[in-house]
Amino acid sequence: MDGDIRHNSYDDGSEDVLTGEQSIRNFNINFGPQHPAAHGVLRMVLELDGEIVERADPHIGLLHRGTEKLMESRTYLQNTPYFDRLDYVAPMNQEHAWCLAIEKLTGTAVPRRASIIRVLFSEIGRILNHLLNVTTQAMDVGALTPPLWGFEEREKLMIFYERACGARLHANYFRPGGVHQDLPPDLIDDIEIWAKAFPQVLDDIEGLLTENRIFKQRNADICIITEAEIEKWGYSGVMVRGSGLAWDLRRAQPYECYDEFDFKVAVGKNGDCYDRYLVRMAEMRESTKIILQACAKLRAPDGQGDILARGKLTPPKRAEMKTSMEALIHHFKLYTEGFKVPAGEVYAAVEAPKGEFGVYLVADGTNKPYRAKIRAPGYAHLQSIDAVAKGHQLADVSAIIGTMDVVFGEIDR
């Protein structure tokens, strides 16, 4: 050190401050992969100018398992469980798209009872998804009670999954040609009892969040999506409906027997995080109505009957296998070799909870798909994070990821 404290022999930058030539460098930080608000294994490199996000660079692929390639070496039936492992928050909705694609190519008509059961469990999946999304988004912005309440309700729905097919999460319940097995009458009764009580739970969650000052401040006017951006980025689902466009595949291109059900399509006005939260809450109420209608239809005389389109795609009844040699051979061939699908290509899409989940299937006439392209909504949503997060504060990034509703099973595949 020099003797005179007033004259530095080293450059401490104080001269630059006087001349105004100090260069301020932007700050790069890693958001994730172990960040609690990253919803899985998202790694994002954020470039910050103070608190403001200048650039958001998502690094995906940490959960990549090569699903689409693996599917090319499995039979059509063996591929169904892969779909449970994509969006593992609401598994049955993904299986639905795969089964619809196979049924389109083979021209299989699904029995009415199976169709109603599919609708019932698709809507249960929608509630499973939205409950998790709404409550974890509340947790991301600082509320701790909603996730506890939300998980309590999800647990009840998981038990319905388990009672229908034996598995809580990876169900493998939807099959090409119908569903794996029929629902017992007391399960239908219990689902109906639950659906009648559920709106009260939604009221409780809304009481905590909807008019909560902090929740509003953290979500209102954050990540506003315009109509032009929707077309540019390929948004679907709540990301579209939150901006005031009533686009819902259950209405626009009805599949299964959705055209028989009475429900409204919830839309927002402002296209921000808060509106998307409100849309998800409204959708859960509409799904509850659909569940109650489905329970009534399953009890009606025209809702009775078989739950599988008996033929080459589906196994024979257990009783037939005990008496008929042909049935036993058919069962053995189906589960070893699998069924063949006529050559062709088809795109089947369903309104999954996160958006339009589609399967583009190319068949070559064998028992395995030639190529299956999975169109996951979360992938299309996450690609736009740089565009929508730019200019927001660092604290808003977790709200934006929460409102996009990303799950890495389906993004990385």
Swiss-Prot record:
<keyword id="KW-0874">Quinone</keyword>
<dbReference type="GO" id="GO:0050136">
    <property type="term" value="F:NADH:ubiquinone reductase (non-electrogenic) activity"/>
</dbReference>
<keyword id="KW-0813">Transport</keyword>
<dbReference type="Pfam" id="PF00346">
    <property type="entry name" value="Complex1_49kDa"/>
</dbReference>
<keyword id="KW-0997">Cell inner membrane</keyword>
<keyword id="KW-1278">Translocase</keyword>
<dbReference type="InterPro" id="IPR029014">
    <property type="entry name" value="NiFe-Hase_large"/>
</dbReference>
<protein>
    <recommendedName>
        <fullName>NADH-quinone oxidoreductase subunit D</fullName>
        <ecNumber>7.1.1.-</ecNumber>
    </recommendedName>
</protein>
<comment type="subunit">
    <text>NDH-1 is composed of 14 different subunits. Subunits NuoB, C, D, E, F, and G constitute the peripheral sector of the complex.</text>
</comment>
<dbReference type="InterPro" id="IPR001135">
    <property type="entry name" value="NADH_Q_OxRdtase_suD"/>
</dbReference>
<keyword id="KW-0520">NAD</keyword>
<keyword id="KW-0830">Ubiquinone</keyword>
<dbReference type="InterPro" id="IPR014029">
    <property type="entry name" value="NADH_UbQ_OxRdtase_49kDa_CS"/>
</dbReference>
<dbReference type="GO" id="GO:0048038">
    <property type="term" value="F:quinone binding"/>
</dbReference>
<keyword id="KW-1003">Cell membrane</keyword>
<comment type="similarity">
    <text>Belongs to the complex I 49 kDa subunit family.</text>
</comment>
<dbReference type="InterPro" id="IPR022885">
    <property type="entry name" value="NDH1_su_D/H"/>
</dbReference>
<comment type="function">
    <text>NDH-1 shuttles electrons from NADH, via FMN and iron-sulfur (Fe-S) centers, to quinones in the respiratory chain. The immediate electron acceptor for the enzyme in this species is believed to be ubiquinone. Couples the redox reaction to proton translocation (for every two electrons transferred, four hydrogen ions are translocated across the cytoplasmic membrane), and thus conserves the redox energy in a proton gradient.</text>
</comment>
<keyword id="KW-0472">Membrane</keyword>
<dbReference type="GO" id="GO:0051287">
    <property type="term" value="F:NAD binding"/>
</dbReference>
<dbReference type="GO" id="GO:0005886">
    <property type="term" value="C:plasma membrane"/>
</dbReference>
